[in-house]
Amino acid sequence: MRVYKFGGASVKDANGVRNLEKIVRLALNDQSSIVNRPIVNGLMVVVSAMGKTTNALERVVDLLDAGKEEQALTQWVDIIDFHVAIMKELGLQPGSDIRLQGEIPYDPNLPYDQNYDQIVSMGELLSTQIIAVCLLKQGLSVEWWNMPRLLRTDDTWREAVVDDQTSREVIRAGWNRPNRPSVVVAQGFIGGTIDGQRTTLGREGSDYTAALLGNYLDAESVTIWKDVPGILNADPRLEPDTVLIPSLRYQDAVELSYSGAQIIHPKTIRPLENKQIPLYVKPFGDPTAEGSCISAQGIGPIDVPVYIWRKNQILITMRAKDFAFVLEESLSDIFDIIHRNHLKVSLIQSSAVTISVCVDNTRFVPAAIEQLKTRFNVTYNDHLSLLTIRGTTPEILEQAKKGRTIMLSQTTRRTARLVVKEE
């Protein structure tokens, strides 16, 4: 079997859904070079929320948390209308083909993060229902899976930890039962607790879902369909003259993802590497193109400089309040606060009396800064980006610094990291 994952940009409108159908049909009729037969009864389609739906649903959560119920309802109606328009363009009947939820699944007595998971998960539930019904009406053998009932997690809201053993058993049983349809459509990004609460796996977690399903079901391959030709050495929206990296090793992919490369979710590689399952990244608009392949046989190390931008960063610097500064103890205190406040660290630098950390600038940062101030003198700079250059040279580094305000830099033999003011 194979696993195909489609991101929100790929299914942002009716034309995207039609192209997904085309790719699915190609897969079902494809004479695979690996198994030398078409994929029969063996295609798992993992789908994210459509377009910018996740961002819109996050806005609903924020408005409700701020007590702005009317604005939240207006935003919610806009989200439903967006999906209804796509359904109608695809010839589907809202309300009969697909049941729409009128009420926002919000409980003011629950913590923010728990409400977040109940509301934001609606994006994937909507998109997959639309796609499953569309494929079914086009004559394909299709089944829709409700992943919150199948992918078991704990209740770490927004960063749920998957119960591998239980999830594997349940998913394998569902997949291996007699007369299962040829195509299964499942949500990425979301799972569920033992008591039926929906959870999310972290931003961009649909890739991780696809990798887990590939591992559980012993897939011959997992393919992520993107709006780019494959894995590039830079974001084409930010850097001109990008180069396709056709083949790379699991290790290189892990390093790129943890540096902030958004082409692959950081957790994606491990489940695939454990079973030596190749991961393909292919262009959604050109399904017959080769794209990129990540595997144990990948070519490495990467022989072109790779530019990775991580936006919306804040640089927090902590200075000792007195001279009784012990680095190890201070780091322990700092990372305890960072962990308790769910901050994502992208860079660390220390000196004799200061420690600086660069983190994603989320709503949790102000509380963390206040807690850090109880132990340290704290300063910070926001509106920053982190540029990581793998495979750098003095010439490349000098060019990267031109015209930019550098707040902090780190350089090793082959990697440079620059914290810069956002332009």
PLM regions: where:
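A conserved regulatory-domain signal marking ACT and ACT-like small-molecule sensing domains
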Residues: 290-423
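Glycine-rich beta-alpha junction loops
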Residues: 49-51, 228-230, 283-288, 298, ...
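Electropositive, surface-exposed helix/loop patches at the edges of structured domains
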Residues: 177-193, 256-280, 317-331, 381-402
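Nucleotide/pyrophosphate-binding catalytic subdomain
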Residues: 1-264, 269, 421
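A conserved active-site cap/scaffold subdomain adjacent to cofactor or substrate pockets
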Residues: 247-295, 300-302, 311
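Short hydrophobic alpha-helical runs that function as membrane-insertion/retention elements
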Residues: 221-225, 279-281, 346
